[in-house]
Amino acid sequence: MPGVAHPGDAPGEDFEKTQVIGKMILSFEKIRRMTVVVISALFLIMTLSACRQQKTVPVDPADLVNTLMGTDSEYLLSHGNTYPAVALPFGMNFWTPQTRRNGDGWGYTYDDHKITGIKQTHQPSPWINDYAAFSLMPVTGAGKITEDQRASWFSHKAEEARPYFYSVYLADYDITAEVTPTERSALFRFTFPESDSSAVVIDAFAGGSMVKIIPEEKKIIGYCRNNHGGVPENFHNYFVIVFDREFDFFSAWVDGALMPGSTGQEGDRTVAVVGFRTERGEQVSARVASSFISHEQAELNLERETGGRSFDNVRDAARERWNIELGRIRVEGGTDDQVRTFYSTLYRTMLFPRIFYEYDGTGEIVHYSPYNGQVLPGRLFTDNGFWDTFRAAMPLITLMYPEMSSHIMEGLVNAYLESGWLPEWASPGHRNCMIGSNSASLIADAYLKGIRGYNIDTLWNAMVKNTKGHGPVHSVGRYGAGYYNSLGYVPYDAGINENVARTLEYAYADWCLWRLAKELGRPQEEVELYAGRTQNYRNVFDSERLLMRGKNLDGTFQSPFSPYKWGDAFTEGNSWHYTWSVFHDVAGLAELMGGEEMMARMLDSVFVVPPLFDDSYYGFPIHEIREMQIMNMGNYAHGNQPVQHMIYLYKYTPEPWKTEMRVREVMDKLYNYTPDGYCGDEDNGQTSAWYVFSALGFYPVTPGTGEYVLGSPLFRKATVTLADGKELVISAPENSRENIYVNEVLLNGKKSRVSFVTHAQLLEGGKLEFRMSQAPNTDRGVSPAWRPYSMSNGK
């Protein structure tokens, strides 16, 4: 064969050609190998460079927030019962996409497929519902007025939800809608297709409303009065909307009648439609503001907060505001999921209570009072249920935002002066929801932690008034106070529901009064009165069952009794949950149980007993019951507030390491930044604040003590920038999914044996170091001298 040498053949021309070709092949192979090596090296360098860049250029915390966390919820099962709030921290107005009709508490639900508008909302909870809502919805075509008519399909893949910005593609109209907020205003931007019938529908909703189109000013003004209670007769939300281009057509819709060319009028439900002839990709912008005071004030809010500013400018400023506030806690050394969950929960702690005041034409702070309907000077806050938030959400504000805490106290002073009572669940005025007089906890905790700038004497008088009876609704003051003050408990058979829960929460509130009375130098008889009432929790403790139990007027316990029965003597829980509501005297509770060892066994039992429940009080399993049942954690019900502090109570026993184990279990198992990321209602920042505190490594079991009980931090490092600029560095360098136990704690390099850290120590800044281990340190924190505060131990 040509080019092939056979044995015995003399070398010839073909052989020489073969050698040349072989050398060429070898050369090409060397080049190929060198190329592969060079390319691989370049790829490695690029990868390492990218990794280094990723470490040195962190993602902004505002972009780590998933505002959709908790939105996969419904009436029978809550994964948060949240909505994607587009707002500034504690802003007067929020904005949210709407997937259901106004008045449905689940206004945005992750599993829904259609959007009906982007509405201004003030809803603190689906159970309280919304007020003062109106919406904007871009459409094309005629007859797209009502929510059902104008609804458009959308996909989460074409949706961007940030704290500072929301964007969605409305597939039925080929429109992109965007919104970005200020405190009392917002900017909208709509990108339209080519159409002669592009329009924006402004819906003031039913309940009494008005729209007025002013074409020559490219403006719509109006008001809405929709609410679910807690407002005076003259309640209005006045709004103004100014577009950046003239209207090509307009019409009004009033109580079902469409009136082309009409500039609008009043009615039960009014809608304005303003239209444009647009080219594909053409953008139309609108500036929106509102006021609870007047149209003139709404105009002031609009010009003060959006005048001369572009959409991008407002969005960038809102993003920067969130980055500043969220960036005050910087976490490192966790998984991507943990970091995103942390910032998503931290965002939720900065929404409520909302600002309910405005700045008048002279720059003075004024507010419309939802208590008496007057416009008055000073601050006011609303949309908060203290039954939930006294536990951790409010203490987090006190720690991180002392000036805000002072303003909230000023707002409580004004609420009392305007209504005669402290609010317990305000939205915007008094609402008949939940129990207790937990405003006492907020006030005592703030004052005892050094928060000033308000009239504490007025608040003291308000707290004392609470102890004597209830106000215009049963949730204000103390329902059953007469029985409580004379018998030392609210009786089971006196026709007052949730009586054990009331007794326990009143006893803690009395402890708050006792602490504050001593600090204020009140007369000794007052101090002794409240000191005695702090022990009323003992009156509803059954020493045979080692659980809290309803007690009758004659002093006998309720019968029959099941610790699995929800409601009845308790509030959204059962005896397994409420037995631990002795925040101020855990040592006293342990004594009743027969000692600290027995209390540890009872704590264990909550996780060991099956998730049985008796729902006969409600007639069906309320969502809190179902959330407990499905978590596979026995009768532990983290999805509701009464039990959230419970796992920290191991720190009051000879087995403090069990707190560390359980805290990490709850953080890992029951929280995630996804739409189903909570294990129950988020509730105005409370369930989120539990996660934030716990991830940092401590928790305020007893607001009013100035102590935080130590747990198990989630991250290797967290840097907390305090209000005065000092930095608190929380370090746990050995932290991991396996190393969940605390072997040793050092505060500023000095070994600390106690199971708590004080508020004063945190405010000093410095370094709090946790040395972590895979196995528990069964010696640390076991001495009674190292335990957190309890009234009975004399600390």
What kind of feature is each model-predicted range?
Residues R33-A41:
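Sec-dependent signal peptide recognition
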Residues L48-A50:
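C-terminal motif of bacterial Sec signal peptides marking the signal peptidase cleavage site
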Residues A509:
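ATP-dependent phospho-/nucleotidyl transfer catalytic cores
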Residues M1-R32:
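N-terminal secretory signal peptides that target proteins for export/translocation
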Residues K55-S441, Y447-L504, C512-N539, R545-M548, ...:
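Accessory carbohydrate-recognition regions in carbohydrate-active enzymes
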Residues L728-S736:
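Short aromatic-glycine motifs in intrinsically disordered, low-complexity regions
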